[in-house]
């Protein structure tokens, strides 16, 4: 419960802030102190002493934003981060933008120079309100401490309602210090008419969608992150069980449906499975749930699902029809919409199983002809082999990733549950993985959290090893170390005449094992298959943090790949069907 009961008494703006966020259920804050935010940190001291909230000290404010982001993705709650004014606030920007494009509800609270100094170019003054306007749902500058509790209540409401996203509250230093007669605004007691999602479903659209599903002989569910946010995994499972509709997901939708199921085709798009991309190209009905038809999914847009009618369901009316005009557009919560459609299907539109069986058999032939590929056994290790082995040892783990080849391989080969896949999808933020692992581990202290990173991405935020060491967070860090900016090199090889401009990462590269050990973190270097399995097992079983520097084959490319401007059916690097699999590879199921 809050430090003080709801009484009229003289309190500071800093007290009002902390009291308000605790009333909203916040248990953890990620942040870094500084001059303008010191009044809030000074007040925080008493709240931590009373065990009412815990602050996690990061080593860079970007890490605070990513940790809050991951905390939110894995729990469904609002993640909170603190930073001071000026460079502290601007260091949050990449993290806020990451949360914005992936629809993650985080609350960023920044210090600001005193009210009298705003606009004077004072020391560490930056217009963070203006800077962040394009990447937040809403921004506030608290000009009167009496508004603090209301602003916090509104911020939490805005973060979570409709399409989730970040909100920023900028707090001038003297607002945190000023005393006033404090009354709290209870959580949820807000009135923001312009921030109300559409909740009444239109029966006509539901009826049209149900009819289209029954009449389809080759339907496909295309599921994005909105379905994860909606907690719709159970109702989607019921729909698939009833109508036997195959499922493909975006990077953000990964985990929404059992990835071991025969009906799961994995990820679609640029590095999706061949059979998912063929299914999209051949389906006659595409049911898009919480997905936004972005370019990495669609490839050449006018050839994406070009034989299909489209049902598009999304909580955000701005997304429906933005890139692809649907035959049926439904604005609403994915779980609620699917529930309505399923109820109507069960009562009025029974399935025709012979149609769906034929479609599933066709997909299964693609699955057999064009499997995901893993290099044949050799003394060296490949990224795919490491990921398959890791997944077998830690089937219920939370996985965070950075961005690049290792992210795409992880999406292909790791099989995860909903909210156990934590990755920067829309913005593609290198450096996300390590601080995201901190956020996930803080949120789930008794679960295994594994950060899959690349040697280039890891160096973006490797200072957060200090945070992991300070709090002894038992994060397992697996670095896929190929001595390149791997995805950049792959594109330079494929599209830029093998001119490898500034993508080699050997000179100046750290010894990751020694680096981790300098922070007091157990670490191993893996450079062959003989010690890979045992090192992975030790890392998973060890009660503290562990780093594994996995020195993999250098020139491995991530396939399949859809080249820019090509349709999803035009993939590079898939097995040729007449040979079953490529000569240097084996099916990952072997």
Swiss-Prot record:
EC top class named in words: transferase
Binding site for FAD: 163, 271-292, 314-333
Residues engaged in binding Mg(2+): 455, 482
Reactions catalysed, as given in the entry: 2 pyruvate + H(+) = (2S)-2-acetolactate + CO2
Pathway per the UniProt entry: Amino-acid biosynthesis; L-isoleucine biosynthesis; L-isoleucine from 2-oxobutanoate: step 1/4; Amino-acid biosynthesis; L-valine biosynthesis; L-valine from pyruvate: step 1/4
E.C. no: 2.2.1.6
Listed NCBIfam families: acolac_lg, PRK07418.1
Annotated family: Belongs to the TPP enzyme family.
Protein name, per record: Acetolactate synthase large subunit
